[in-house]
Amino acid sequence: MSQKSKNPRNSYDDKFNIIFVGDENVGKTSIINRYINNTFLDEKKETIGIDNYSKMVTIKQKKILLKVWDTVGQEKIALMTKSHYKIAHEIILVCAIDNKDSFNSLNDWIENIKDNLPNETIPIFLMANKCDIEDTREVPREKLKELSQAYNIDFVECSAKENINIDETFTRMLNDIYQSNYIKNGLGLEEGSSSSGVNRVCC
């Protein structure tokens, strides 16, 4: 991806795209709204299609336009195609710790991504939502760790409702995207600035 040149129509240096996928009612829209608007939206939407949200962020003194794509109404894995994934700089899988079926389907989601993007290496990150309701947990942390290790992806337990590990996770993802794209373009970065390899649980 090439760096954007500033011009009268652009007030940012670059644009990053993150797409959220996963089963219905796991909190994808709630996570996005918590980060973009700092509000909790109980996920009751029935919109068909893909919604997108925008937020201007600053990374290493560069203005970045973040576009977050919410696959509302596209929760059936078969509906997701290359055209959905190819815009992404990072793909976020979401499950809910109180819904074991949403966890069990993650393997199918990951395989669907690989099938649609066989020659690309778009990073995948797992957010296990609703960690504030520990008493109804159906997905053991050990299972999350096993899946993370099996596919070499990072994961975090989070809560959109209680705002746990939301901002920190987006900051980590944005920094990783920035590093990946600017290294690829030979623009140089500080050594040792990567934040990858972080798995977080509720605390």
Q: Where do the protein language model's features map onto the residues?
A:
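Conserved Walker B
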Residues: 72, 97-98, 131
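Switch I (effector-binding) loop of TRAFAC-class P-loop GTPase G-domains
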Residues: 36-63
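Inter-motif core of Ras-like GTPase G domains
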Residues: 78-100, 106, 112-116
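Generic enzyme active-site microenvironment
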Residues: 68, 94, 127
